[in-house]
């Protein structure tokens, strides 16, 4: 399995809007992606950043999702700072 790891910055006052966009757009799109297994989206305690870990069956699936994530417009107040594909090497 492979993970797409995305890190974002969230502008002041935009956390609720970012969460709404996440629930209404990002998560449903991720679920439909080829090879999707599971996804986790996290927010920093201060609400200024977030990190997601989305698991895919194959490296090409994760790479395609990463390309889409990098090419898609972010919600207002959200800036994508990194998109990486990593191999899942252990699971508990």
Model-derived features: where do they sit?
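Short S/T/G/P-rich N-terminal loop/turn motif that feeds into the first structured element of a domain
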Residues: 1-50, 57-68, 78-92
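RNA recognition motif
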Residues: 69-73
């Amino acid at each position: 399995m492979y993970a797409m790891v995305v890190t974002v910055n969230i502008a002041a006052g935009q956390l609720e809007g970012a969460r709404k966009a996440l629930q209404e757009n990002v998560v449903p799109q991720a679920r439909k992606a080829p090879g999707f297994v599971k996804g986790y989206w996290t927010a920093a305690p201060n609400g200024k950043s977030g990190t997601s870990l989305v698991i895919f069956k194959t490296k090409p699936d994760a790479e395609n999702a990463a390309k889409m994530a990098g090419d898609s417009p972010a919600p207002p107040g959200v800036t994508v700072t990194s998109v990486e594909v990593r191999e899942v090497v252990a699971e508990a």
